[in-house]
Swiss-Prot record:
The gene is pyrD. One of its GO terms (cellular component) is plasma membrane. InterPro entries: Aldolase_TIM, DHO_dehydrogenase, Dihydroorotate_DH_1_2, Dihydroorotate_DH_2, Dihydroorotate_DH_cat, Dihydroorotate_DH_CS. This is Dihydroorotate dehydrogenase (quinone). GO terms for biological process: 'de novo' pyrimidine nucleobase biosynthetic process; 'de novo' UMP biosynthetic process. It comes from Helicobacter pylori (strain Shi470).
């Protein structure tokens, strides 16, 4: 009831203005362990059936918040308190950048979807690392999503990713290379076998922490599988599928710029993930993101082969109860099918 009133006010504002107001509150809450404890007591949810050990990291539950919400690593404590099993911060770039011109964030309310053309706006890796350390340690794994600065030419992209990773080596529990945002010109062109191989070979030499590749939902299936295979062969530990889509046919009134996320992406993301899991289940840790907004969809992705999940748009539309609702219902679905834990259900449809 409270969030429905707050949502009505927030949705009367420009989408980015509303996000900034929420972030300001979350930053304030993150500075207070007491307030974070109150949030956790109201909206957190813990159940041993949902716990899992993946790549040496303990996940209290499989539901994470996707990159893009906490771009500067300034509100992780508060977000964890809302029940997430892990968070992915960023996207961070080597140098600070302002991103694309506003307006650059839009709602498609009927489709419960968002369209963003943000362009990796962030304060840069150095300031983000300081912010991370200010509030560390954290109660869940934290991923760091890494991107390329807009001004960097493609020929120097590998050096730029090396530079941003180098500045983040002492923060986070895993790293995700973002080559799939549609909002940095030509970034998606880096989703090719040769570059991905170079990128992960380089990163593997720099860190022993888990490395992930985040892919676009708009690749042809064969191209996607080739890129993913190249990443895994070069040392990637996991694949996150998918980023936002540039398929404007999925909403009634799309804006010209930006990628779409939310319920409009559910079917497309699920289909991509199904093909990914068929080829790489048990060969890599698979993370499903895109249009997940309830326990039923979350459970389907897990049975399809997802060890972990991520949400974003659904959190905007459904508010602070979302994690708790999904996780409680997920436990019921596991019990109904006779699974003793979420770990047992991973990839059940492939067995």
């Amino acid at each position: 009831m409270l969030y429905s009133l707050l949502k009505k006010y927030l949705f009367s504002l420009d989408a980015e203005d509303a996000h900034e107001k929420v972030c300001k509150i979350l930053r304030m809450l993150s500075s207070s362990p007491f307030l974070c404890g109150l949030i956790d007591s109201q909206w957190g949810y813990k159940n041993p059936k949902l716990e899992n050990e993946i790549l040496g990291l303990h996940f209290p539950n499989p539901l994470g918040l996707a990159a893009g919400f906490d771009k500067n690593i300034s509100m992780l404590r508060a977000l964890i308190a809302f029940g997430f099993g892990y968070l992915e911060a960023g996207t961070l770039t080597n140098e600070a950048q302002v991103g694309n011109e506003r307006p650059r964030l839009f709602r498609h309310i009927e489709e419960e979807s968002l369209q963003n053309a943000m362009g990796f706006n962030n304060h840069g890796a150095i300031l983000a690392a300081r912010s991370f350390n200010r509030f560390a340690p954290y109660k869940t794994p934290i991923g760091i999503n890494l991107g390329k600065n807009k001004r960097i030419e493609q020929v120097h992209a590998l050096e730029d990713y090396k530079a941003v990773l180098n500045k983040c080596l002492n923060i986070g529990d895993y790293y995700t290379f973002n080559l799939s945002s549609p909002n940095t010109p030509n970034l998606r062109d880096l989703q090719n076998k040769a570059f991905v191989n170079e990128l992960f070979c380089m990163a593997k030499e720099m860190t022993h922490k888990p490395l992930f590749l985040k892919i676009a939902p708009d690749l042809e299936i064969d191209d996607m599988l080739e890129v993913v295979n190249s990443a895994i062969e070069a040392g990637a530990h996991g694949i996150i599928a998918t980023n936002t889509t540039i398929d404007k046919s999925l909403v009634f009134a799309p804006k010209e710029m930006g990628g779409l996320s939310g319920k409009c992406l559910t079917k497309k993301s699920r289909e991509i993930f199904k093909e990914l899991a068929k080829a790489f289940f048990n060969k890599s840790v698979l993370v499903s993101v895109g249009g997940i907004s309830d326990a039923k969809e979350a459970y389907e992705r897990i049975k399809m082969g997802a060890s972990l999940l991520q949400i974003y748009s659904a959190f905007i539309y459904n508010g602070p109860n979302l994690c708790q609702n999904i996780l409680k219902d997920l436990v019921k679905l596991l019990q109904k099918d006779g699974f003793l834990s979420v770990k047992e259900a991973i990839g059940a449809d492939l067995r």
